[in-house]
UniProtKB/Swiss-Prot annotation:
Coiled-coil regions, chain positions: 82-119
Lineage top rank: taxon: Eukaryota
A GO cellular component entry from the record: nucleus
Keywords: Cell cycle, Coiled coil, DNA replication, Nucleus, Phosphoprotein
Name listed for the protein in its UniProt record: Geminin coiled-coil domain-containing protein 1
PTM field: Highly phosphorylated by CDK2; stimulates initiation of DNA replication.
Recorded name of the encoding gene: GMNC
Subcellular locations according to the entry: Nucleus
Residue segments, region Disordered: 143-167
Length: 334
């Protein structure tokens, strides 16, 4: 069977030139093609034509995809650069840690040499001797016993300190030591003088002058009881005399006033001599809880003197130029 194979057939090559491996002209004697050979060759030509047609379509679909090739390369380069930078940081950290480790090893070697030195061994021997001694054990035992005791057990009830009252008690002890013993003053004396105590004036109450206001005749009759003696102004006590708490009595001075002059003698003493303070007297029928006699006289425009007479003595209260009060107590002397 003689056959001519058309190599330019478009069914085999898709419309393109195709180099046929066989010659275009054959003879029966040179080529013998069976039916099976013809079918296999025809199927191979069909497959080659399909592959050539699918290749341009694949290139077009790849070019039309959502990830273009230049953008993909730039993203990969950015990821690679970040990884390289991270790797460089880790390498620097590793170098620093290695240097620090080497320094620690060196310090450790120096410490070992110091511990193996003779000085440290000598100190260890001394410490062992001290710990093994009996004195240290006794002292440590006392310290442990003292530490177990509470603060309440360390002090007795009388020895427990009171920081709040310590200063107050100390000041009271000093005050008791500084005070001098003296006879007490009756409360009615202080009330009559208008004083709270010997050093404080009571501004709320005034001196008791009820005896002078309610019994003028009694005062006048007292002057008339002594007609023979005269008043000695030179011997009258002065305001600057010191206070004497002795309980002695003295004989009173007497006045030359008569019963007919009545109470006018007090009005005549408006401007007495400077040394005049009081006119003492004594009556047995006057109660000791009341003022026997008291009067006020002005020695100067800015100085007032008030005098009070009692069985125990005489009291003088004077206001000075600064506005304060001065108190003087003169007991009776025998």
């Amino acid at each position: 069977m003689n056959t001519i194979l058309p190599c330019q057939d478009q069914y085999f090559v898709g419309g393109q030139s195709y180099n046929c491996p066989y010659s275009t002209t054959t003879s029966e004697s040179s080529v013998d093609v069976s039916t099976e050979t013809w079918v296999s060759f025809w199927a191979a030509g069909l497959l080659d034509n399909r592959e050539l047609q699918q290749a341009p379509q694949a290139q077009e679909s790849f070019s039309d995809s959502n990830f273009p090739l230049p953008d993909l390369c730039s993203w990969e380069e950015a990821q690679l650069s970040s990884q390289l930078y991270r790797n460089k940081q880790l390498q620097d950290t590793l170098v620093q840690k290695e240097e620090e480790l080497a320094r620690l090893h060196e310090e450790n070697n120096h410490l070992r040499q110091y511990l193996n030195s003779a000085l440290v061994k000598c100190l260890e021997e001394k410490a062992k001797k001290l710990l093994s001694s009996d004195e240290f054990s006794k002292a440590y035992g006392k310290f442990r016993k003292g530490k177990r005791k509470s603060k309440e057990q360390r002090y007795s009830p009388a020895e427990i300190p009171h920081p709040k009252n310590a200063k107050r008690n100390l000041s009271s002890e000093f005050a008791n030591c500084e005070e001098q013993a003296g006879p007490p003053v009756d409360p009615w004396v202080l009330q009559t003088l208008g004083l709270k105590d010997l050093d404080t004036i009571d501004d709320t109450s005034s001196a008791n002058y009820s005896a002078l206001a309610s019994h003028p005749r009694r005062v006048a009759s007292t002057f008339s009881q002594f007609p023979d003696d005269a008043v000695d102004y030179k011997n009258i006590p002065r305001e600057d005399m010191p206070i004497d708490y002795r309980g002695d009595r003295t004989t009173p001075l007497h006045s030359t006033a008569t019963h007919g002059e009545d109470f006018h003698i007090l009005s005549q003493l408006s401007n007495p001599p400077v040394g005049l303070k009081t006119l003492p007297y004594y009556t047995a029928h006057v109660s000791p809880n009341k003022t026997e006699m008291a009067f006020s006289t002005s020695l100067s425009p800015h100085c007032n003197v008030k005098t009070h007479s009692f069985h125990q003595g005489q009291a003088f209260v004077r206001r000075d130029e600064e506005g304060g009060w001065k108190f003087t107590w003169v007991p009776k002397q025998s």
